[in-house]
Amino acid sequence: MKKTDLLVIGGSAGGILSASMARKAYGDIDITVIRDTDAVMVPCGIPYIYGTLHCTSKNVIPDKMLTDSKINLAVGTVVKIDKDNKTVTTKNNDTYSYKKLVIATGSLPIIPTFIPGHELENVFPIYKNQDYLNAILEKLETVENVAVIGGGFIGVEFAEQISMTGKKVTLVEMADACLWQAFDKSFTDDIEKMMK
């Protein structure tokens, strides 16, 4: 069993921030971050993989950010949390005991199951897994037309980046305008004109 003062489950933005802030606030305690992938994507940079960057490796959060702060990193999928005994077990049967636990496992995309065809081949929700994102990158090389569902910040960024590669992109938003949650109508009208 591995012992740590603070165990953080999740190695993306929330987990990294939690571990880093704990290091600053509590000094020399033992901190361990468990994540389920070897590499962690910069979440807000994911759309740029498909245009500006052309690869996932340029969108990886460096482990050095944590290791330089003497934060331990472990790769594994947590399958059990025993809050009474303050232990966590991974799929590989590694067990960690902790004094404090932070669960920062991130978000998942909303799948619009009300749209017929959402389960078909070549429909890709965006997950933060590097291998999965690489598979999408490879698939994009073989297509000419791309539909992006969702006209919020991420959808608009995806549409813009993919269009930079010469693909015909259709951006679909169920509201009256893209980016409507962040800007007023006059501004969203201007944005839509620019996107066309």
Model-derived features: where do they sit?
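Aromatic side chains
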Residues: 48, 96-98, 153
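FAD-binding core/adjacent interface of flavoenzyme oxidoreductases
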Residues: 1-7, 32, 66-147
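Short beta->alpha junction loops/turns
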Residues: 11-12, 39, 94, 129, ...
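Beta1-alpha1 glycine-rich phosphate/pyrophosphate-binding loop at the start
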Residues: 2-72, 161-186
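Conserved phosphate-binding and hydrolysis motifs of nucleotide-dependent enzymes
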Residues: 10-15, 106, 150-155
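Predominantly flavin-linked oxidoreductase catalytic cores and closely associated redox partners
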Residues: 123-196
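Flexible, glycine-rich phosphate/dinucleotide-binding loops
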Residues: 15, 40, 87, 110-111, ...
